Amino acid sequence: MLVRIPQVLNAEQLAMLREQLDHAGDAWVDGRVTAGYSGAPVKFNQQIDERSEAAAQCQHLVLSALERNPLFISAVLPNIVYPPMFNRYSEGMTFGLHVDGGVRLHPHNGRKLRTDVSATLFLSDPASYDGGELQIEDTYGVHSVKLAAGDMVVYPSTSLHQVKPITRGVRVGCFFWIQSLIRDDGQRALLFDMDNAIQTLNQTNADERARRTLVGCYHNLLRQWSDT
């Protein structure tokens, strides 16, 4: 399930984040330092050092925004969110086809985190750079994603994906992974559809008993499928 989440960051938050990143200096390092065995040969970008003060401040801003975003919570059903990371692609940089690693170590507590959902939060105006599309492959084909600054896309971490080469300008972004309460993408998609239906019914004069029944089905499925 691929879901676009608009305006995760408002203009003020976006400006604060870009101010931090644009003046991060030596905190920008070779992106291959965090790449796995298969990803390193095709990864050519820069990342903010996860241990830097710039990373900590930017992570706090993004995580605070996610906690207040109902669409993110509904679509992802987050259990554990990996601390957001930040990357930069300048002219000629790219990240070839790869699948994200299935398990990562949380940098703050060392615990293992299963990567169920991948997220990319766009931080650059799409008119400021050419190329840099996030291409995600699934059974329906190839989806090319290039969103407005502040918008985010989430998709199954099982997906083969790539960032196309930059031919002009600079693309700055935020990326991270989520261990969901529901590890199966099909089950998450079903619960997401049910939640959307419930929210629609809440805004109408739908039969209250029928609405309560649907809410009960949602929570009983969540209880049955949840890993926690």
UniProtKB/Swiss-Prot annotation:
GO terms for biological process: DNA damage response; intracellular iron ion homeostasis. It comes from the Bacteria. This is PKHD-type hydroxylase Rmet_3078. Fe cation binds at residues 98, 100, 161. It comes from Cupriavidus metallidurans (strain ATCC 43123 / DSM 2839 / NBRC 102507 / CH34) (Ralstonia metallidurans). Its cofactor is Fe(2+); L-ascorbate. Keywords: Dioxygenase, Iron, Metal-binding, Oxidoreductase, Vitamin C. 2-oxoglutarate binds at residue 171. It is an enzyme of class 1 (oxidoreductase). Its EC number is 1.14.11.-. Coiled coil: none annotated. The lineage of its organism: Bacteria, Pseudomonadati, Pseudomonadota, Betaproteobacteria, Burkholderiales. GO terms for molecular function: 2-oxoglutarate-dependent dioxygenase activity; iron ion binding; L-ascorbic acid binding. Transmembrane segments: none annotated.
